[in-house]
Amino acid sequence: GALDIDEYPLDHNKLIDKLEELKVPCIVCRSKSGGAHIFFFFKEWMNAGDFRDKAAEISSALGHGRCEIFPKQEQILVERGDVGNFINLPYFDSEQTLRYAIIRREGAYVEASLSEFIEEIQKVKTLPKDFLTLPIGGPVDLLPNYIPCLRTKLAIGVFEGERNRTAFQL
């Protein structure tokens, strides 16, 4: 799965710091347009609906609650010809790409080569059950009847400029 953050300019290093602070296993890549694609990798098959719920919680905690979440569909009907939506993958035209992973090496942020990206995938792959129980915005059972983005906002606080919208959503 992935999050697509279209914010320009975007400080990829701060984004990585926040994800590490939240202990979210993922890889941040620069997108074609300079935003970020945050990729999540799993050791086993994962239900798309479950992924989307947790990804919404993570995106809210990052302050990007309106970013796109991939997969966009919770299910597709193959017999009807559905194929789902796509996201541009990193390392297109890998010799001179603008779409690369950003990793921390020896305390510094670096543009990862394709082989380093593949190595990083092995490090961040997680089990779906571990991903779903990440305590992003506090205890997993906090306010279970609220939508994920509101649970996160109520647990970690409302970002500047979001007070009125959050109050209206409540």
Question: Which role does the model predict for each range below?
Answer:
Residues 1-3:
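N-terminal catalytic cores of peptidoglycan-degrading enzymes
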Residues 5-8, 17-20, 34-51, 56, ...:
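Modules that initiate DNA replication and primer synthesis
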Residues 9-26, 66:
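A broadly used, surface-exposed interaction patch
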Residues 21-23, 32-35, 82-84:
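Short, well-ordered loop/turn elements at secondary-structure boundaries
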Residues 26-33, 68-72:
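Short beta-strand
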Residues 27-31, 39-41, 88:
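A structural signal for short, well-ordered beta-strand segments and their strand-loop junctions
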Residues 59-98, 117-129:
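Flexible helix-coil linker/hinge segments at domain or subdomain boundaries
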Residues 85-87, 103-106:
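Short, surface-exposed amphipathic charged segments that create phosphate/polyanion-binding patches used
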